[in-house]
UniProtKB/Swiss-Prot annotation:
The protein's role, per its UniProt record: Cell wall formation. Catalyzes the transfer of a GlcNAc subunit on undecaprenyl-pyrophosphoryl-MurNAc-pentapeptide (lipid intermediate I) to form undecaprenyl-pyrophosphoryl-MurNAc-(pentapeptide)GlcNAc (lipid intermediate II).
Pathway(s) this gene product operates in, as recorded in its UniProt entry: Cell wall biogenesis; peptidoglycan biosynthesis
Name listed for the protein in its UniProt record: UDP-N-acetylglucosamine--N-acetylmuramyl-(pentapeptide) pyrophosphoryl-undecaprenol N-acetylglucosamine transferase
Species name: Escherichia coli O1:K1 / APEC
Family of this protein: Belongs to the glycosyltransferase 28 family. MurG subfamily.
Length: 355
């Protein structure tokens, strides 16, 4: 499907969970001849990341309202109006055929600006429960899509766009068949790390002994303290790294993952075909719990809420998963994934531009 001469503006910012799926769709459409620009904020990750992908970015001034004081709330309408006016001027100059909202504060004024100019608005909700901005924008959007069922009652479930190197991994049957020895446990805390996992997993390693080998991604600034915790638990042999640059290689190595359940993490684990033990971040709307629930229902994962988390709970769960069970769970995870999510979102963008 050629997009020669078509123009897209992607609105996404703040976190990797919004930005990386947007980049996947952008690259897919650029390969079809689309021109793509980005709308973001200058003080968040998209400011550095998006230009590295060869995409020009425009900035508006906007920030979130949650947890702000009364003065900020009083000033909010004026701030939103100014951000809308900035976005509108940018879009009048660029003249996109369609805008794609992938979440983050920038999507609110950006989506309203597009709507006020008669530009189709396509939305994608990455999480199992809709964010405030997308709830508002859904009322004016041309098309609303969701990664997991339940965020919107009638929106099409299309999955989350994930990186091509993860999608290219061999299927679980090919990858895991014939593996022997200690079960390979990948612990992923995200770029900031997950303190609860950093504190719990060294004790889990002590309980499980030689039955597991662990690769623990600790997050920025935590590698030394986590290595020390493993050593103090009598388990210095396990590998601890601050970051993992090649997640596809880490997934290929692992037999099972212990991690938070951010939207992109859940989608990548399903696409990779891996069993998981999810410990959702305690957010008031339980966003990460709802992200993980479809894989638990599919028999591909187990959720332990943070309030129920203990060394015994994690150790007993991992000890109860034989290699046969892990392979079955891995196959169920892969079966629950939507590997063509990027194409599905891109196709809806193309349809909206032609409508």
């Amino acid at each position: 499907m050629s997009g020669q001469g078509k123009r897209l503006m992607v609105m996404a910012g703040g976190t990797g969970g919004h930005v990386f799926p947007g980049l996947a769709v952008a690259h897919h459409l650029m390969a079809q001849g689309w021109q793509v620009r980005w709308l973001g904020t200058a003080d968040r990750m998209e400011a550095d990341l998006v230009p590295k992908h060869g995409i020009e970015i425009d900035f508006i001034r906007i920030s979130g309202l949650r947890g702000k004081g009364i003065k900020a709330l009083i000033a909010a309408p004026l701030r939103i109006f100014n951000a809308w006016r900035q976005a509108r001027a940018i879009m009048k100059a660029y003249k996109p055929d369609v805008v794609l909202g992938m979440g983050g504060y920038v999507s609110g004024p950006g989506g309203l600006a597009a709507w006020s100019l008669g530009i189709p608005v396509v939305l994608h909700e990455q999480n199992g429960i809709a964010g405030l901005t997308n709830k508002w924008l859904a009322k004016i959007a041309t098309k609303v899509m969701q990664a997991f069922p339940g965020a919107f009652p009638n929106a099409e479930v299309v999955g989350n766009p994930v990186r091509t190197d993860v999608l290219a991994l061999p299927l679980p049957q090919q990858r895991l068949a014939g593996r022997e020895g200690p079960v390979r446990v990948l612990v992923v805390g995200g770029s900031q790390g997950a303190r609860i996992l950093n504190q719990t997993m060294p004790q889990v390693a002590a309980k499980l002994g030689d039955s597991v080998t662990i690769w623990h991604q600790s997050g920025k600034g935590s590698q030394q303290s986590v290595e020390q915790a493993y050593a103090e638990a009598g388990q210095p042999q396990h590998k601890v790294t601050e970051f993992i640059d090649d997640m596809a290689a880490a997934y290929a190595w692992a037999d099972v993952v212990v991690c938070r359940s951010g939207a992109l993490t859940v989608s990548e684990i399903a696409a990779a075909g891996l069993p998981a033990l999810f410990v959702p971040f305690q957010h008031k709307d339980r966003q990460q719990y709802w992200n993980a629930l479809p894989l638990e229902k599919a028999g591909a994962a187990k959720i332990i809420e943070q309030s129920q988390l203990s060394v015994d709970a994690v150790a007993n769960t991992l000890a109860g998963w034989s290699r046969e069970i892990l392979l079955t769970m891995a196959e169920r995870a892969r079966a629950a994934s939507i590997p063509d999510a990027t194409e599905r979102v891109a196709n809806e963008v193309s349809r909206a531009a032609r409508a």
